[in-house]
Amino acid sequence: MTSSSPTGGGPGRPSALAPEIADRLKRSADGLLPAIAQQYDTGEVLMLGWMDDEALHRTLTTGRCTYWSRSRGEYWVKGDTSGHFQWVKSVALDCDADTVLVKVDQVGAACHTGTRTCFDTDVLLADQ
Amino acid sequence: MTSSSPTGGGPGRPSALAPEIADRLKRSADGLLPAIAQQYDTGEVLMLGWMDDEALHRTLTTGRCTYWSRSRGEYWVKGDTSGHFQWVKSVALDCDADTVLVKVDQVGAACHTGTRTCFDTDVLLADQ
């Protein structure tokens, strides 16, 4: 692990995220924030990923939603492998700066299983 | 801390959650899953809370969204203090069973700051 950069990197990874954002993030013990991806026009909740400071920085500046893969330990531009990009429309933090909401335009399926969202299959309680 | 119950309690807390659900949950190190609350008809993402097995069980069986408060270390029925209940309409797990999506009918403001959602104020990137 490298040390955090002076420009606001999360624990272990340097980042170019603006300090005025980085300074108020409330990260988990592993330096991450949950990031909800929502289809900007239909309102569908597509998936939840994780971002460190640099993933948030890249999401804000590249126009493509970028996560930190906890399983692979690397940055992950959604769509780089599948072509199912998430084009960023807007980004907001929640009231205590520990969660990210990214509104996106999802190309194709958000879920690696091929369904539109990651929440389509495992329904525990149906419409009440 | 008490030990987990044989019926599927998360680390440290007993739970009556059905074993067929509990057995496939992929919890964080502290035994929790992020839970996204979404307004069922408008699609607004209202907030993100955290659930352990028992909070999920209560959400599924009481009709009111129930979280585990990480800061207070106790169960938290949304609305018990504020009156801003979240009436549960549907509950789903994501494709790898580590995130919950609860569609609710939100009474009043979801956010403790008084805004409708927790994502209304801190916009990092506006509509592109």
UniProtKB/Swiss-Prot annotation, chains A, B:
It comes from Streptomyces coelicolor (strain ATCC BAA-471 / A3(2) / M145). This is Phosphoribosyl-AMP cyclohydrolase. Zn(2+) binds at residues 95, 111, 118. Its EC number is 3.5.4.19. GO terms for biological process: L-histidine biosynthetic process. The keyword Cell wall biogenesis/degradation does not apply. NCBIfam families: PRK00051.1. Catalyzes the hydrolysis of the adenine ring of phosphoribosyl-AMP. Belongs to the PRA-CH family. Keywords: Amino-acid biosynthesis, Cytoplasm, Histidine biosynthesis, Hydrolase, Magnesium, Metal-binding, Zinc. Mg(2+) binds at residues 94, 96, 98. Its cofactor is Mg(2+); Zn(2+). Binds 1 Mg(2+) ion per subunit. Binds 1 zinc ion per subunit. The gene is hisI. It comes from the Bacteria. Pathway: Amino-acid biosynthesis; L-histidine biosynthesis; L-histidine from 5-phospho-alpha-D-ribose 1-diphosphate: step 3/9. Pfam families: PRA-CH (PF01502). Homodimer. It is found in: Cytoplasm. PANTHER family: HISTIDINE BIOSYNTHESIS BIFUNCTIONAL PROTEIN, PHOSPHORIBOSYL-AMP CYCLOHYDROLASE. Coiled coil: none annotated. It catalyses: 1-(5-phospho-beta-D-ribosyl)-5'-AMP + H2O = 1-(5-phospho-beta-D-ribosyl)-5-[(5-phospho-beta-D-ribosylamino)methylideneamino]imidazole-4-carboxamide. InterPro entries: PRA-CH, PRib_AMP_CycHydrolase_dom, PRib_AMP_CycHydrolase_sf. One of its GO terms (cellular component) is cytoplasm.
